[in-house]
Amino acid sequence: MEWVWALVLLAALGGGSAERDCRVSSFRVKENFDKARFSGLWYAIAKKDPEGLFLQDNIIAEFSVDEKGHMSATAKGRVRLLSNWEVCADMVGTFTDTEDPAKFKMKYWGVASFLQRGNDDHWIIDTDYDTFALQYSCRLQNLDGTCADSYSFVFSRDPNGLTPETRRLVRQRQEELCLERQYRWIEHNGYCQSRPSRNSL
């Protein structure tokens, strides 16, 4: 009789996993996203890495909205080059609105030419504006609509991180993105604030 219950349990687990939709078009984003409330300083405390060379840690981003309602951002963080050369690098991004207020096209580039540049989707998956935000970008989709190359940041207003309750919420949203256990924590030790200008790009 035990094997019957085991089969029932396996069927239930299989059915639950089959219900999850990992197509990018199915992902929920923040409803009624407010750019003005989102503006200001954010500390990246975890990220899912894409292909290519991006900022690695000590990442601080500042979002701003101009008088015409256009959003832009600057970011600074540490990058390791040639395995042993560490520098602080700056990146810049401008955002184009779409029909969904939480979905943008982000044109970004590094002040230094070796950094990644592109024009990616930039989605705000969730935020409460005051403590946390979860961002997601898919740069390349598979034929079945799932993502082949994505990156995602968990942002906090506090460099010390998030509360346990907020972390649980973020993990739930990461699972909805089919990215559970793919993030790594980002260190903030003041590296780029303490570096001389010759170590910045």
Curated annotation (Swiss-Prot):
<dbReference type="GO" id="GO:0042572">
    <property type="term" value="P:retinol metabolic process"/>
</dbReference>
<comment type="similarity">
    <text>Belongs to the calycin superfamily. Lipocalin family.</text>
</comment>
<dbReference type="GO" id="GO:0032868">
    <property type="term" value="P:response to insulin"/>
</dbReference>
<protein>
    <recommendedName>
        <fullName>Retinol-binding protein 4</fullName>
    </recommendedName>
</protein>
<dbReference type="InterPro" id="IPR000566">
    <property type="entry name" value="Lipocln_cytosolic_FA-bd_dom"/>
</dbReference>
<keyword id="KW-0732">Signal</keyword>
<dbReference type="GO" id="GO:0005576">
    <property type="term" value="C:extracellular region"/>
</dbReference>
<dbReference type="GO" id="GO:0030277">
    <property type="term" value="P:maintenance of gastrointestinal epithelium"/>
</dbReference>
<dbReference type="GO" id="GO:0060068">
    <property type="term" value="P:vagina development"/>
</dbReference>
<feature type="signal peptide">
    <location>
        <begin position="1"/>
        <end position="18"/>
    </location>
</feature>
<dbReference type="InterPro" id="IPR012674">
    <property type="entry name" value="Calycin"/>
</dbReference>
<dbReference type="GO" id="GO:0030324">
    <property type="term" value="P:lung development"/>
</dbReference>
<dbReference type="GO" id="GO:0034632">
    <property type="term" value="F:retinol transmembrane transporter activity"/>
</dbReference>
<keyword id="KW-1015">Disulfide bond</keyword>
<dbReference type="GO" id="GO:0002639">
    <property type="term" value="P:positive regulation of immunoglobulin production"/>
</dbReference>
<dbReference type="GO" id="GO:0007507">
    <property type="term" value="P:heart development"/>
</dbReference>
<dbReference type="GO" id="GO:0009410">
    <property type="term" value="P:response to xenobiotic stimulus"/>
</dbReference>
<dbReference type="GO" id="GO:0006094">
    <property type="term" value="P:gluconeogenesis"/>
</dbReference>
<keyword id="KW-0683">Retinol-binding</keyword>
<dbReference type="GO" id="GO:0060041">
    <property type="term" value="P:retina development in camera-type eye"/>
</dbReference>
<dbReference type="GO" id="GO:0014850">
    <property type="term" value="P:response to muscle activity"/>
</dbReference>
<dbReference type="GO" id="GO:0060065">
    <property type="term" value="P:uterus development"/>
</dbReference>
<dbReference type="GO" id="GO:0007283">
    <property type="term" value="P:spermatogenesis"/>
</dbReference>
<dbReference type="GO" id="GO:0071939">
    <property type="term" value="P:vitamin A import into cell"/>
</dbReference>
<dbReference type="GO" id="GO:0045471">
    <property type="term" value="P:response to ethanol"/>
</dbReference>
<dbReference type="GO" id="GO:0060347">
    <property type="term" value="P:heart trabecula formation"/>
</dbReference>
<dbReference type="GO" id="GO:0060059">
    <property type="term" value="P:embryonic retina morphogenesis in camera-type eye"/>
</dbReference>
<comment type="subunit">
    <text>Interacts with TTR. Interaction with TTR prevents its loss by filtration through the kidney glomeruli. Interacts with STRA6.</text>
</comment>
<keyword id="KW-0813">Transport</keyword>
<keyword id="KW-0964">Secreted</keyword>
<dbReference type="InterPro" id="IPR002449">
    <property type="entry name" value="Retinol-bd/Purpurin"/>
</dbReference>
<dbReference type="GO" id="GO:0048562">
    <property type="term" value="P:embryonic organ morphogenesis"/>
</dbReference>
<feature type="modified residue" description="Omega-N-methylarginine">
    <location>
        <position position="139"/>
    </location>
</feature>
<dbReference type="GO" id="GO:0042574">
    <property type="term" value="P:retinal metabolic process"/>
</dbReference>
<dbReference type="GO" id="GO:0016918">
    <property type="term" value="F:retinal binding"/>
</dbReference>
<dbReference type="GO" id="GO:0048738">
    <property type="term" value="P:cardiac muscle tissue development"/>
</dbReference>
<dbReference type="GO" id="GO:0032024">
    <property type="term" value="P:positive regulation of insulin secretion"/>
</dbReference>
<dbReference type="InterPro" id="IPR022272">
    <property type="entry name" value="Lipocalin_CS"/>
</dbReference>
<feature type="disulfide bond">
    <location>
        <begin position="22"/>
        <end position="178"/>
    </location>
</feature>
<dbReference type="GO" id="GO:0008584">
    <property type="term" value="P:male gonad development"/>
</dbReference>
<dbReference type="GO" id="GO:0034633">
    <property type="term" value="P:retinol transport"/>
</dbReference>
<keyword id="KW-0488">Methylation</keyword>
